[in-house]
Amino acid sequence: MNRQVIKKTKKSRQTANKSQIRDVFTVICKTDLGVECVKEYKFHPERRWRFDYAIPEHKIALEVEGGVWTQGRHTRPQGFLGDVEKYNQATLMGWRVFRTTPTDLYRTTTINLLKMAINTPFLP
């Protein structure tokens, strides 16, 4: 096998694993919070922006900010500026956007934060 094939194989395995992990979070939302959570939810009618997770019924979004310690896309200047634009537009559209890290995604604090948001009406 050449290096490119090995690289593609590793990448597809990593993508599959991430997808399975995210499905677990949507199940947690359903069982613990009693709401439908959608992964990769497209919220803007014109832009290709997506939330990592969304609870559309309550207009609550959860963004998982990866690469915090490794200079990932969200922490580099261009990625950060893009996120600012995305989050501001989402807020103007009435969304409440919460941010977390991959490490904190399944923690009780994150689930409790979403629970409080669901039980607290958003005042426009």
Predicted region positions:
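Nucleic-acid endo/exonuclease domains
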Residues: 1-124
